[in-house]
């Protein structure tokens, strides 16, 4: 999952200006900054708040301060006005947050016993939503959002393919060296 993120997300963002990241092809469309931030918040919430029943990294590590957003903001159910009003994000900070979330996700997955795939952490509020369904959701939604980011880039820059999209000669570094892999 990380490899797909690193091989597609970072090149799709590479070299984009702040204005390009805020481009909306329609008044009711999301822009790249919102999509990337939303992806990180979704994964953080699912892995920490839902699966592990702990506070998110957003809360624990005060990423909201680093990104200049309210601590309770989760990126869900935004109105068009809220998407437009999202403060301009420093993409390096947003990606640092996403990488911290992804490293925490990988550590969680490293210790996840197979029996937990069928566990439903919150049967009252989310009956039938198991760890396995949550992980499937993260993969599908993440893939959809990666496609949206690449599409928004393509709308603005045309058929521009960063070298790393088509070549594995310069791979991204392995995530989370502390995992020992």
Give residue ranges: language-model regions.
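A short secondary-structure junction motif
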Residues: 16, 112-115, 152
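Acidic/histidine-rich alpha-helical segments that form the ligand environment
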Residues: 70-119, 133-141
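A generic structural signal for well-ordered alpha-helical segments enriched in polar/charged residues
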Residues: 7, 11-14, 45, 100-107, ...
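Short, contiguous alpha-helical
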Residues: 2-13, 20-77, 121-181
């Amino acid at each position: 999952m990380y490899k797909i993120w690193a091989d597609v997300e970072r090149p799709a963002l590479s070299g984009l200006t702040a204005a390009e990241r805020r481009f909306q092809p329609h008044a009711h469309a999301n822009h790249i900054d919102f999509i990337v931030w939303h992806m990180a918040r979704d994964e953080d919430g699912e892995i920490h708040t839902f699966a592990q029943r702990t506070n998110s990294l957003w809360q624990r590590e005060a990423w909201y301060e680093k990104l200049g957003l309210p601590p309770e903001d989760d990126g869900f159910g935004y109105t068009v006005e809220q998407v437009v009003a999202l403060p301009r994000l420093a993409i390096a900070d947003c990606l640092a947050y996403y990488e911290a979330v992804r490293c925490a996700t990988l550590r969680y997955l490293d210790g996840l016993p197979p029996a937990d795939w069928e566990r439903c952490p919150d049967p009252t509020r989310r009956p039938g939503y198991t760890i396995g369904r949550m992980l499937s959701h993260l993969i599908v939604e993440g893939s959809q959002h990666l496609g949206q980011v690449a599409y928004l880039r393509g709308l603005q820059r045309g058929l521009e393919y960063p070298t790393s999209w088509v070549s594995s000669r310069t791979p991204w570094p392995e995530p989370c060296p502390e995992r020992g892999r």
